[in-house]
Design a protein with these regions (language model features):
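N-terminal secretory targeting modules
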Residues: 1-43, 102
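Secreted/periplasmic serine-hydrolase-like ester/acetyl group-modifying domain
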Residues: 124-228
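Active-site segments of SGNH/GDSL-like serine hydrolases
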Residues: 222-251
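Substrate-gating cap/lid alpha-helix
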Residues: 242-275
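Short hydrophobic beta-strand that contains or immediately precedes a catalytic carboxylate
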Residues: 45-48
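Well-ordered, non-membrane alpha-helical segments in soluble/globular domains
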Residues: 62-65, 92, 211-219, 252-263
Length: 312
């Protein structure tokens, strides 16, 4: 009995220590940045991933899309809430937090088609478990318990393990062609024509299921915003589709049209417009005219800023 109470006291001390320490730990990016932004009362919150701010070495103007939009719409205060690898799963938690705040900024959400691919969707470092926990916690007090809850495995801090990620099926259309482990990151980083071709296939040529978890997040984002009277504008980011078609012919564009149609169908079902920019520009608008990337150069970012400005 004495041993039992000793262990009980020990675990209580550890638990309380973790709580005390957690008060001195800075909130993760999503929760901290969103909280600070809401306090400042911006008119527009611009979500997004690296497609918002990536630039080309040759750009004379390296401003992100958000800054270009500010120049086009000087009457609006626009906050940049973009960060590399952000996605609809995180945006769902962010919109939920905004709805709880009672504030009603306009929100702009870019939809990156590659974020639905097994290659990105299940990548462990893109799950943002800690940020989503902070954003969806019932109260700030509960959020303070993240550290002890994680230590004692009361919450799942590894939504997808690397082992699970490597076993994720990879598809070309509806046909499985392997698993993630069959495609080596380091090898694909070398830009040979064959590796570029493979990267286009991994990033875009899967068949997007309407039941995909990120599309569930899209539906939830719209429902939360509609209930709270928050206006959201969506757009699908430009894709270097001409380069993809060089490798795969009409199969590439047909699959991409099918996938973007799946996204747009959900938006239209929810009475939202779908600004589909996927096929709107040629390779000269991209950071690299040959690589499978949504990263735009100066001309490309200005094009997107102008299209978004028309919605506001």
């Amino acid at each position: 009995m004495k041993i039992f109470w000793s262990w009980t006291v020990f675990f209580i001390i550890i638990f309380l220590s973790q709580i005390a320490i957690s008060h001195f730990i800075t909130e993760p990016w999503g929760a901290r940045t969103l909280s600070e932004t809401l306090d400042k009362g911006y008119d527009v919150l611009y979500f997004g991933d690296s497609t918002v701010d990536a630039s080309a070495d040759t750009d004379t103007d390296k401003a992100p899309i958000t800054e270009m939009l500010r120049r086009l719409k000087p009457e609006l205060s626009i906050a940049d809430l973009s960060r590399s690898s952000n996605h609809l799963g995180l945006y769902e938690a962010m919109v939920g937090q905004i709805a709880k705040s009672g504030k009603k900024p306009v929100i702009i959400i870019p939809i990156n088609m590659r974020s639905f691919s097994p290659w990105y969707d299940k990548r462990p470092e893109f799950q943002f478990e800690k940020e989503i926990f902070y954003l969806t916690a019932p109260s700030p007090l509960i959020a303070c318990f993240y550290k002890p809850l994680a230590v004692f495995r009361a919450i799942n801090v590894n939504a997808v393990t690397f082992s699970e990620f490597y076993q994720t099926p990879v598809y070309r259309g509806k046909k499985q062609i392997g698993i993630v482990a069959d495609f080596n990151d380091t090898v694909l980083a070398t830009t040979t024509p064959e590796n570029i071709k493979t990267s286009f296939m991994l990033g875009y040529m899967f068949d997007l299921d309407a039941k995909h978890r990120k599309l569930d997040s899209l539906r939830n984002i719209i429902d939360q915003a509609d209930r709270s009277g928050i206006k959201i504008y969506f757009y699908i980011t430009p894709i270097n589709h001409e380069q993809g078609e060089k490798f795969y012919g009409k199969e590439f564009k047909e699959q991409m049209e099918k996938n973007t149609d799946t996204v747009c169908a959900i938006l239209k079902e929810k009475k939202h417009s779908c600004l589909n920019l996927a096929f709107s520009v040629d390779p000269s608008y991209f950071q690299s005219p040959v690589l499978p990337s949504e990263h735009l150069n100066e001309k490309g970012r200005m094009f997107v800023a102008e299209e978004v400005a028309k919605m506001l």
